[in-house]
Design a protein with these regions (language model features):
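Acidic, glycine-enriched active-site microenvironments
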Residues: 1-141
Length: 141
């Protein structure tokens, strides 16, 4: 799992796969082959806790090594209230000398805004995409 990796990278593909398997297992034991509302809530809660735990532990590790004056949480993830709560708790308890900045919900946009701006700039520059263009999730802007 990413939480035990020695680097500072985040990846949730393993977590998402684990959730998929857990959901399928739960659905198999339910008579209607669906999750109950309680099971959905439980899965969402556990997913959020696991995702936030990785972010907090990796951030603490980075703060310990690089000694920044400020930790900034921005982008779509900054809208997550649990992440904000745990980040404030971590800074207060373990790194009181570090300033924590969390963008407001209004400014907590995700990659869609960045992609839209990039597309707009390409349009302004009259950049054309070839018709045989293939989607690539790792394509640079």
């Amino acid at each position: 799992p990413m939480i035990r990796s020695k680097n500072y990278n985040f990846s949730y593909s393993g977590l998402k796969t684990a959730v998929l398997y857990a959901v399928n297992k739960l659905k198999a034991v339910n008579s209607d082959n669906k999750l109950t509302d309680e099971q959905k809530i439980m899965m969402a809660y556990e997913f959020e806790q696991a995702a936030v735990e990785v972010l907090i532990k990796k951030s603490a590790k980075a703060i310990t090594k690089f000694k920044p004056k400020t930790l900034i949480i921005a982008g779509g993830v900054a809208a997550n209230q649990e992440l904000g709560r745990q980040a404030r708790e971590m800074i207060k308890k373990d790194f009181p000398e570090v300033r924590l900045l969390i963008s407001t919900r209004e400014l907590s946009t995700d990659n869609a805004t960045m992609i839209a701006v990039a597309a707009y700039l390409h349009l302004q520059n009259k950049t054309r995409i070839p018709k045989n263009f293939k989607a690539d999730g790792n394509l640079s802007l």
